[in-house]
Amino acid sequence: MELLKLVIVDDEPILLQGLLDTYDWESMGFEVVGSAKSGVQALEVIRREQPHVVLTDIRMKQMTGLMVMEEIQKEQISCLFVVLSAYRDFEYAKQAIKLNVTEYILKPVNVEELNYLAKRLDSFDT
């Protein structure tokens, strides 16, 4: 099975490092090809790496995960977005759905959710 190229985005350094270090991404079918600490940095990494999947925090300073999704869609870069959120506010979920988010996951994330996600994403045409 080919590994899905993954970019991870979170503006909280501790959470970003935790996402990078805590999970065995390769065993779940992902190759982490980049990470970003802001929406602006995420755009640069996504443009450069052309990942299959972007795992992004929804609320970040300056540029939100939703804004990143919008910009990438405008540029017609083909990738799947998985949004992470600590907020149970339905408005965020509604906005993400309008932008065709692939998956919306509430923090904290657990391994079972990520394994399920990996299997689900593997069935998409990336």
Can you name each region flagged by the protein language model?
Residues 5-7, 34, 82:
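A structural signal for isolated positions on well-ordered beta-strands in alpha/beta enzyme cores
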Residues 1-2, 76:
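Short, flexible coil/linker segments at domain boundaries that flank nucleotide/cofactor-interacting
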Residues 18, 22-26, 45:
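Alpha-helical interaction/dimerization surfaces of two-component signaling modules
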Residues 43-126:
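CheY-like receiver
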Residues 27-32:
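A generic structural motif
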Residues 33-40:
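Conserved Asp/Asn-Gly motif in the active-site loop of CheY-like receiver
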Residues 3-15, 19-20:
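Conserved acidic segment of CheY-like receiver
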Residues 9-10, 36, 54:
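Conserved sequence signature across two-component system core domains
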